[in-house]
Amino acid sequence: FPAAARHRRGLQTCSRYQTLELEKEFQCNPYLTCKRWIEVSHALGLTERQIKIWFQNRRMKWKKREQRQVPQQQMGAGGAGETETGIGPRGGR
């Protein structure tokens, strides 16, 4: 095994309080500056790296949700979904 694989850290979870505070911060700004990473890490008792990775993961979750919503909105606007009778294109529901 490579040296990096042997020294891999376990999954570190945030407390409910930390998660709520990170979510509040994300709502204000999804991109933090290095200075803000430091401030948030000290306030929440997490490392700067944990803050940085949490925000990277949260932005990916945000983007995936947005991508899922766009096709649904297009289908709702008269796409190839159900007809007025509620029956799909192949006769099934």
Curated annotation (Swiss-Prot):
Gene3D superfamilies: Homeodomain-like
Region named Disordered: 64-93
DNA-binding stretch(es), residue numbering of this chain: 7-66
Keyword DNA-binding in record: yes
GO biological process, one term: regulation of transcription by RNA polymerase II
Family assignment from sequence similarity: Belongs to the Antp homeobox family.
Protein name according to UniProt: Homeobox protein Hox-B8
InterPro entries membership: Antp_homeobox (IPR050296), HD (IPR001356), HD_metazoa (IPR020479), Homeobox_CS (IPR017970), Homeodomain-like_sf (IPR009057), HTH_motif (IPR000047)
Oligomeric and partner information: Forms a DNA-binding heterodimer with transcription factor PBX1.
General function of this protein: Sequence-specific transcription factor which is part of a developmental regulatory system that provides cells with specific positional identities on the anterior-posterior axis.
Gene: HOXB8
GO CC terms, sorted: nucleus
